[in-house]
Amino acid sequence: MHSLIGLVVTLFVFVNFSLSNALPYDFNIRNAGNATFDYVIVGGGTAGLTIAARLADRNYQVAVVEAGGYYELMYPVTRVPGSCSLGAGADIRTKTPIDWGFVAQRVAGANFRDIHYPRGKCLGGSSASNFMIYQRPSIQSMARWAELVNDSSYLFENVLPFFKRSVSFSPPKATRFANSTPLFNATAFDKEGQPVQVSYPKYAMPFSTWVKQALNEIGLQEAHDFNSGSLMGHQFCAMTIQQTDGSRSSSESAFSSQNRQWTFYLYAMAKRILFDNQKRATGVLVEQGNEFILTATREVIISAGAFQSPQLLMVSGIGPSYVSQTYGIDVIADLPGVGQNMWDHVFFGPSYQVAVSTLTLLASDPLYLLSQAEAWFFGGNGVLTNPSTDYVAFEKLPLVSLSGFSQENKQDLAWFPSDWPEVEYLAGSTYVGNFSDPYVQQPRTGQYASIIGILVAPISRGNVTIRSADTADMPVISPNWLETDTDKKVSVAAYRRARDLFRTQSMAPVILGQEYFPGLEHETDSEILEIIRNTMMTIYHASCTCKMGVSTDRMAVIDSRARVFGVTGLRVVDASAFPILPPGHPQSTIYMLAEKIAVDIIIHGS
């Protein structure tokens, strides 16, 4: 069934692509050979393409080194929002052609399971494969960011123009169900913002309308919007979706729509950052069949993501000195924080059989799948315009949920500002289970839905390191999920809250039978925690592994202008650069950071 879904939808997408001539051929593609540019950017993902485009717009000569190619050719199905779960499972066998295929091995907090960690390996990076949710951090979370890096330019009101710069907002279509009209604040966006498209799916999940009522019943308020600095409450969420045709809007599809003088090295692997005797970054050693050098007369910018940005630094001699010495790498800068401080969000949740249509039907009924693929292909309509998780809620846990928390647990949570939620809930119009393979594991009879709990104020921290001096060898990823007692307590409380939502009077008309998964026999805190450990999955928000900070912080890797400490001519611009992972979904913040640093470079030079 998994292959059938991929085959049918891929066929429609590929035909659609051929007809629309949508492939961005205006990219200047170059093959192996020494060359010189003003800026060399490693990674053509969410941040990399954004900063490359802004610099190219100012007539700088920019090269982008990308290990993948066009996702439209490698895996065209990813253009369809409803397909995003296909490659997102915990089982590495769900890996797609545009996925690096990282695996966090024997994760202790997940009962020593090996967990597949999807990351985009293509132009567009993870913006080409994520679940597309677009919302911004809270005001006080950005105040904490500004405090940690000692730079008021990161206060919410000061970064808001950079959030607005990348995106163009379209209000929801009137074709949605009457009870699924999203609230939004149009002033949170700029009419001049371009080119990433932010809107709403034309189709709203029916289950989400029932979750909305249940959230009201347990005391959460509907939010006006999640893009003006407040996250508490619940609403239909905005997404990076092209409203006209119902397709994904990625950094590649967005920024490639305009002609620019930039150069791309595709299917090319950055092997090492090169330095002169003054520890100035002078270029990048690249492999694309043969090795060659791209010289940067101004700067090298690393935008390789939370796993490979620290990896590239370490193999280049920047990182903990003991790591360099272990693998015979010359030490350029001893920065012990490289690869440390990894933040992430994990999810889990119960599932019920329900009396409304859900995505389960796509996996069990080929004719329905075919009809929906046709609806998407011919008009950008139908269920495939929706990635399934279109309703979002955030809260700080109520006092009753904290009754079993120790003083230490409460102190841990007190670090987070008052507008920083502890838990996020997603209305999942699908069976979640252990998320090993989101489509293959769907029940074959009936419709199923889940309420997913997500830790968005985690205390546990992971790390990333290298296994050799070669970037071709996958980095070692140790996420350390649920390492702390506080994270365990919050997880159990969130699971109980998800169950409470299913038990509301509001939800009763659509619930069929008892809890399908894991089953109400799992009721004690220890039993629920064991279910969580056996089933939890990352929601793909790894960050902070090259954290921004002040020079007196030994664990800081870059300053507030994204410049790497201990060297010159080198910056890191992606989610690894975050000092903290703000609550919610980070793609908006990655775009913001890339816009902000691009302006810094343009104004202040290198």
What are these regions (language model features)?
Residues 2-606:
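N-terminal redox-cofactor-binding region of secreted/periplasmic oxidoreductases
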